[in-house]
Amino acid sequence: MASPAMHPVPPVADVPRHIAIIMDGNGRWAQRRRRPRVIGHRAGARAVNRTIDFCLEKGVSALTLFAFSSENWGRPQDEVDALMKLFLHALDREVGELQRRGVQVRFIGDRSRFAAPLRDRMAGAERSTAANARLVLSIAASYGGRQDIATAARALAEDVAAGRLQPEQIDEALLSSRVALADLPAPDLFIRTGGDTRISNFLLWQLAYTELWFTETLWPEFDAGVMQQALDDYAGRERRFGLTSAQIADKATETSSA
């Protein structure tokens, strides 16, 4: 069994440092209005802007959004094509404003399946915002959590085969350094909209000790009020990371008296 020392307890605050969100419900939102699914995705893009605004206002340092999973390539081709066009137009339209507001944009996932113009826009957005530090916005696109772990494991195996690494050197910390978002704190709060209560292959390694919060609200209707409900719930939780409540209290006392 891993000792508590393997999982250092991060400082706990009312506002999470890193929020990860599965943005679910765009299609159902459109269907309830008897509109094409792409209309729901467009409405969902506006919810992304509201969420970024909220995070900037509250001082959240990292926001990771699940935009398109590796499994989503199996959706109807017309919907995939519409999503790719929406993604491309959103980058053209929004990156300048994100740059002005100090937001750093990153993408995680297998971008090789995207068309060259979209890959170029993604790389350009990363370059133009790389120096920004108010908020790190990571967009998971063509991403899968299992794929992420497998890619990290393969990289470690290649290092062992090349003699750069010994098998006994591989531990949780080393694997953590090879998965996506390795340079960011692990997500403190995970939010999923749309009513489903699962994490759907999103950040499987990174969410090990994350607080989970689910809402029936469909993503296009997600706003500051719902986001504040999530933060209020988060602020009332005790994050123990495998320790006891007494140990957490002792650590808090040590920190405050240091």
UniProtKB/Swiss-Prot annotation:
What does UniProt list as catalytic?
D24, N72
List positions binding Mg(2+): D24, E211
Q: Is Transferase one of the keywords UniProt gives this record?
A: yes
Q: What is its EC number?
A: 2.5.1.31
What the record notes about the co-factor is: Binds 2 magnesium ions per subunit.
Task: Identify the Pfam families for this entry.
Answer: Prenyltransf
What keywords appear on the UniProt entry? Cell shape, Cell wall biogenesis/degradation, Magnesium, Metal-binding, Peptidoglycan synthesis, Transferase
Q: Which CDD domains match?
A: Cis_IPPS
**Molecular functions (GO terms):** ditrans,polycis-undecaprenyl-diphosphate synthase [(2E,6E)-farnesyl-diphosphate specific] activity; magnesium ion binding
Q: Which reaction does it catalyse?
A: 8 isopentenyl diphosphate + (2E,6E)-farnesyl diphosphate = di-trans,octa-cis-undecaprenyl diphosphate + 8 diphosphate
GO biological process, alphabetically ordered: cell wall organization; peptidoglycan biosynthetic process; polyprenol biosynthetic process; regulation of cell shape
Q: Locate the residues binding substrate.
A: 25-29, 37, 41, 69-71, 73, 75, 192, 198-200
Q: Which GO terms describe its cellular component?
A: cytosol
- Cross-referenced SUPFAM superfamilies, in alphabetical order? Undecaprenyl diphosphate synthase
Q: Which cofactor does it need?
A: Mg(2+)
Task: List, alphabetically, the NCBIfam families matched.
Answer: uppS
Please give the family membership noted in the entry.
Belongs to the UPP synthase family.
What this chain does, per the entry, is described as: Catalyzes the sequential condensation of isopentenyl diphosphate (IPP) with (2E,6E)-farnesyl diphosphate (E,E-FPP) to yield (2Z,6Z,10Z,14Z,18Z,22Z,26Z,30Z,34E,38E)-undecaprenyl diphosphate (di-trans,octa-cis-UPP). UPP is the precursor of glycosyl carrier lipid in the biosynthesis of bacterial cell wall polysaccharide components such as peptidoglycan and lipopolysaccharide.
- Quaternary structure annotation from Swiss-Prot or TrEMBL: Homodimer.
What name does the UniProt record give this protein? Ditrans,polycis-undecaprenyl-diphosphate synthase ((2E,6E)-farnesyl-diphosphate specific)
Organism (species): Xanthomonas oryzae pv. oryzae (strain KACC10331 / KXO85)
What taxonomic lineage is listed for the species of origin? Bacteria, Pseudomonadati, Pseudomonadota, Gammaproteobacteria, Lysobacterales
Q: Which gene encodes it?
A: uppS
